[in-house]
Amino acid sequence: MELEDGVVYQEEPGGSGAVMSERVSGLAGSIYREFERLIGRYDEEVVKELMPLVVAVLENLDSVFAQDQEHQVELELLRDDNEQLITQYEREKALRKHAEEKFIEFEDSQEQEKKDLQTRVESLESQTRQLELKAKNYADQISRLEEREAELKKEYNALHQRHTEMIHNYMEHLERTKLHQLSGSDQLEATAHSRIRKERPISLGIFPLPAGDGLLTPDTQKGGETPGSEQWKFQELSQPRSHTSLKVSHSPEPPKAVEQEDELSDISQGGSKATTPASTANSDVSAIPPDTPSKEDNEGFVKGTDTSNKSEISKHIEVQVAQETRNVSTESGENEEKSEVQAIIESTPELDMDKDLSGYKGSSTPTKGIENKAFDRNTESLFEELSSAGSGLIGDVDEGADLLGMGREVENLILENTQLLETKNALNVVKNDLIAKVDELTCEKDVLQGELEAVKQAKLKLEDKNRELEEELRKARAEAEDARQKAKDDDDSDIPTAQRKRFTRVEMARVLMERNQYKERLMELQEAVRWTEMIRASRENPAMQEKKRSSIWQFFSRLFSSSSNATKKPEPPVNLKYNAPTSHVTPSVKKRSSTLSQLPGDKSKAFDFLSEETEASLASRREQKREQYRQVKAHVQKEDGRVQAFGWSLPQKYKQVANGQGETKMKNLPVPVYLRPLDEKDASMKLWCAVGVNLSGGKTRDGGSVVGASVFYKDIAGLDTEGSKQRSASQSSLDKLDQELKEQQKEFKNQEELSSQVWICTSTHSTTKVIIIDAVQPGNILDSFTVCNSHVLCIASVPGARETDYPAGEELSESGQVDKASLCGSMTSNSSAEMDSLLGGITVVGCSTEGLTGAATSPSTNGASPVIEKPPEMETENSEVDENIPTAEEATEATEGNAGSTEDTVDISQPGVYTEHVFTDPLGVQIPEDLSPVFQSSNDSDVYKDQISVLPNEQDLAREEAQKMSSLLPTMWLGAQNGCLYVHSSVAQWRKCLHSIKLKDSILSIVHVKGIVLVALADGTLAIFHRGVDGQWDLSNYHLLDLGRPHHSIRCMTVVHDKVWCGYRNKIYVVQPKAMKIEKSFDAHPRKESQVRQLAWVGDGVWVSIRLDSTLRLYHAHTYQHLQDVDIEPYVSKMLGTGKLGFSFVRITALMVSCNRLWVGTGNGVIISIPLTETNKTSGTPGNRPGSVIRVYGDENSDKVTPGTFIPYCSMAHAQLCFHGHRDAVKFFVAVPGQVISPQSSSGGADLTADKAGSSAQEPSSQTPLKSMLVISGGEGYIDFRMGDEGGESELLGEDLPLEPSVTKAERSHLIVWQVMCGNE
C-alpha cells in the first residue's frame, strides 16, 4: 500500500524507473572523476576490476537510501493510521456517551410514568374494594328490609285482631264505670238496673245509657302520648318478642328524640309501628347511613298517618257508644215482657255496629285495604254463643263478675304493659343504634386497612426511590469529582491526549481489543492491496527492475563510450499558486527531494485536532464545527504542489506546457455555475433522490409516433417486423454482426437522449414532495407537488414506447433454458391468496378486476404443461382494438386458441408461446370505477401535442382517445418506503398519477430496459413490469423474481447493456430481464455483512462501492472479472486532514459516471471527480488489452454479440477534489445536457481560474465537437473547505451564485451545478 501511495502522490516519474539520491550521485560523480584521473594517468586496465566493485557498493548504498526513504513513508502512514484510530475512538466515545444520556433520560421518564400508573391502579383497587363493600351492605339491607316487611304484615294482623277485642273491653269498662257512678241512686232504679244487666250481658258492651252519657267518655284515645289500654291482652304475646329482640349482638348509634316519640306514639295506637323483631332492627340501622334523612322522613310520614287514623278512631267510637245507649234506652221499655234470650237476640244492634265498625275499619286501616277478618270471625262466634247458650249461663256469668276489681286490675295491667313497652322500645332503639355503629365501624376498618396497605406500598417505593437517589447522588458526586479532576487535567494543555487518564481499565482493555482488531483487519487489507498492486505492477512493467539496476551502469558506461552527451535534467515541477487579491495563478518552481515532501512536513500536525479540548457540549457543537472547518481550511491552504482552478484541487499534471495539452485539459474541467438552497421557502425539506427526465420514445410497436390523439408513420411497409426478421435470417453472419453492432450504438445514443429537466424528491417527517426544475435555470421551480405520506426512496425516468422494445407477450419465447415448471397466475376473482409457483424463481402476480378474470392458471396433472384458462371476455376485448394498431392483435395471438373455446392447453416447450397471462382490457376502457385504489390505474391525462396541453374544451373525442395512450409516452416511476409505486407522466400534467400499485415491501431501486421496468424490493425480490398490448404500462400483471433465501434487501441496480446488475448483500446478481432469469452471480466483497451500495456503468466496466468502505472496485461488464481497486481514503485524508470531522473515515454515498469522469460523493460531503483513462492502463502489455481493434463479446446462452468499447480505468493520481461540498452526505449526482455559460465565458464566470486556462477556454477545439453537460450534486448544507464557516457563506460564485449569509440557510438542502464540456462520442 505504501508503494502504491508513493506512486499516487509522486509528481512525475521521469524518464527512468528510479533516480539516484543526491548523496549517491555526489559520490558517484567524485569516483567518476577519480577514475578519469587514473585512466588518464595510467590505463583502463587499472580500473577494470575495480569498477564493478565500486558500482556494486554504490548500488547497495542507493538501495539502502531507498529503503530508508520507504521506511520513513511507512512511518508517516502508520502515524496517520494511529491518528485515524484515535479520531475514530474519540468520535465513537462521544456518540456512546450521548446515547447513554438519551437512554438514561428515556429510562427515567418511563420509570416515572410507570410509578404514576401504579399509583392510579392502587387507588382504583381501593375504590373498587369500597364499592364492593357498599354493594354487599346494600344487599344485606335489602334482604333485612324484606324480612321486616313480612314480619310487620304478620304483626299488623295480630295487632288488628287484638285492637278489635280491646275496643269491646273498653266499651264494657265504660259501662261498668257509669254503673258504678249510678249505684248510689234509689233502690228501684237499682232493681231495674240489675234486671237490665241480666237481659243485656256485659260481654256485649251494650247497656242502655243516657244520651248525654256519651259526653262522659274519657279522652284517653285522643291523646297521642297516652299508651292504649287495649294492650292488656297483648302483653303475653309481645313480651317474648321483646326478649328475642334483645338477643341481637349489633349496637347502632344513639337515636334521635323524634324517633323515640314516634315509636312510642305508634305503639300506643296499636298501628303499624309496633314492636319490631330483631331482623327489622338490624335492617333499620345497617341499611341507612347515619347521615341519610330517609328514616326520619318515613317515620314522620307514618306518624302523621297514625295521628289522623287515631282521631278518626276516637270519633267513630264516640258516635257508636251514643247510638248504642239510645237504642238500649228506647228498646228496654218496649221489650221487658219478652224472654231474655229472645230479647237479647232481637234487641242487640250488632249488625248496625258491624256496619259502623266496618266503616271505621276501612278508615283506620293503615295497610291499604287489608280486611279485618279476625273482627268478623269473632263477631260471628259471639252470635253463635249467644244463640246456642241459654239465659241462665249468661246470667251466671254476669252476676258472678266483679266489675270494680276487674277495672283496677285491667288498669294496672295496662300501666305495667305500657312501661314494659317503653322499656322494650328504648332497648330496641339502643340496639339499632349499636348495630348501625358496628356496621359503620366495620366499613371504616376495611377502608383504613386498604389505606394502610397503600401507605405501606408507598413507603416501600419511597424507600427504593430514596436508595436510588442516594446511588445517583453518589454517582453524581463521583462524576463531579471526575469533572473537577478532568478540568484540572485539561488545564495542562501540554500533556498529549493519549497520555491523559480518561478511561477505566475495563474500557481501556475493550478499546485496545477493538483497536487491535481494527488494526489487524487494516493490516490484512493493506497487505492484500500491496500484494495485488505489486503483482500488477510487476506484470504491467516487467522492465522496471532492469532499468533500476542498469541506471548506475549507464552512468559509468560513459567512461568507456565515445559520446560525451550529458543527461538532461528533469524539468522542475510547476506549482500554480492562487493569489486571492489578483485572481491570478502564477507558476513557481520548487525543488522536491523525495516523496515525503508531499506528505505533511510537520510531524506534530497529525495531532493538531487531538490536542484540542473536548469539553464542548451539544450546545457548542456549532462552534466546534466552525473551529474544525477552520483547521480544514488551514490544512487546505498548507497543501503545496497542486493547482487550484474552478474550485477544484488539481494534480500537478495540469502544469502549462508549450504544446497546449494542459490547456485542453484545463478547459474540460467542471465549472461551478449554480449554488443555492433547493427551496427557499421550506427549510425542513431534506433531499432524497433525483433523476433527469428522458423525453424520448412514445412510439407505437409498429413505429408510429404519437402526437396528440393521432399516430403517424414514416414508412409502413418498411416497418414490417416479420419481413425484417426474415431478411435478417437470410443475411450472412457478417452482416448480422454488423447490424447488431449498429443496433448497440443506436441503443447507446437513445440512452443519452435526456432533457434538461430534473425531478427531485424531498421529504419531511410526514410527506414526500416532488420538485421539478430545469438544470439550465435551477433557481426557477417549474412545479412542485406532494406524492404521498411516506418517503420516496427512488425515482426513475422511463422513456416512452419504442419500436426496439421487447414485444409484450414474448417474454419467455426465446429462453430455451428456462425451467419447464408449472406456471400459475395468482389472484382470481374469488381468491385473494397468492399461489406461488416458480418458473426459475419467477412468480406471476395478477390483480383481477371486476368482471375480468386475470387468466387464472392451474398446475397440470403431469407437471409439464399448465392449463391456461382464458376469460370469455377476451374475444370481445380483442375485437375492440383499433385497426390502426395491427400489432396489438399480434401480441395476443399467442394467448388465443380458437375463438369459440374457453380453455386451451399450452405446452411451455413450444416456441413462441406466451406464458405470462392474458393482458385484460387492452385499451383500458372497461376498468370499472369501483376498483380498489391500490390497483386502480388512472389513465386520465390531457391531449399531448408537441408536449403542450390543449385546452379541455377542445376536441373532446380526441382528448378521450389520447387519455388511453397516456402511459405510452415517457413517464416517471416513484417508489415509496411503504411499498407504493406511482407512475406520473413526464411530458405534461406532472401532478396526475397515471398508475399506482402497492407492493409487499419497500421499493429501493427502479430501472428500465427496453420496455421492461424492474423494481427492487426490500424483501429480496424483483418485480418486473411490462407494457400491455396497447403500449401502456400494465401494473396489475407483473412477475416476481426471487433472488434467494434468506431474504435481504436489493440495495441498488444498474443497467449494463441489455442486462441488469443487482446489488444483493455482498453479491452482484446479473439478471436477464427479457428471459426473467439470473445469468450470473459473484461476490463483490468477501464478507457477507458488507453490502453493495452503488453501481455505475460505462463502457465495458462497472464501478462498485461497498457500504462503510472507501474502496471502489471495477468489474468487467462481460467477463465479470475484477479489474481494479481504488481507495479514496488516503487521498481525502491527505487533502483535508484527519480531524474530528472524520474526513479520514470515508464512506461512499453517491456514485456516477458522466462526461468521462467518475463522480464520487462521500458521507461527509466531499466531492471527488476522477478522470477516466479510456486507453489501456499501460502500453507495456499490448497482447492482453488490444487498442485499435474492436473487441466483441459473445453470450454463452445465445448467438448475440456485444461490441466492446473501453474499460473505464482511473487513477487517484489524477483525482480532483472539489472545494465546494456539503455539510452532510452527498445524496445524489444527476447529469443532464444543458449549457448555462458559453465556453468562451467559462473562465471569466468561474470563481477560480488561471490566465492560460482562460485563454485556452476561448479557443474551442475545431477537431472534436464538444457537448455541454450539467452535473448536479444534492446534499444537506454547504461548506467551502477553503473558507471554513466564516467565509463560506459570503463567497459569490459569479453573478448567478448568491449565497445566503445566514447559518441556517447554509445548513439547508443545497444544489451544486457544474458545467462540463465533453466530447461527442
Swiss-Prot record:
Primary location class: cytoplasm
Keyword terms, alphabetized: Acetylation, Coiled coil, Cytoplasm, Lysosome, Membrane, Phosphoprotein
Modified residues (Phosphothreonine): T217, T292, T348, T365, T418, T586, T595, T1264
Localisation: Cytoplasm; Cytoplasm, Perinuclear region; Lysosome membrane
Similarity field: Belongs to the JIP scaffold family.
Induction statement: Up-regulated during neuronal differentiation.
Modified residues (Phosphoserine): 109, 183, 185, 194, 203, 238, 251, 265, 268, 272, 311, 329, 332, 347, 588, 705, 728, 730, 732-733, 1188
GO cellular component: centriolar satellite; cytoplasm; cytosol; lysosomal membrane; perinuclear region of cytoplasm
Alphabetical list of PROSITE patterns matching this protein: RH1 (PS51776), RH2 (PS51777)
One biological process term in Gene Ontology: retrograde transport, endosome to Golgi
Name used for this protein in its record: C-Jun-amino-terminal kinase-interacting protein 4
Alphabetized InterPro entries for the sequence: JIP3/JIP4, JIP_LZII, RH1, RH2, WD40/YVTN_repeat-like_dom_sf, WD40_repeat_dom_sf
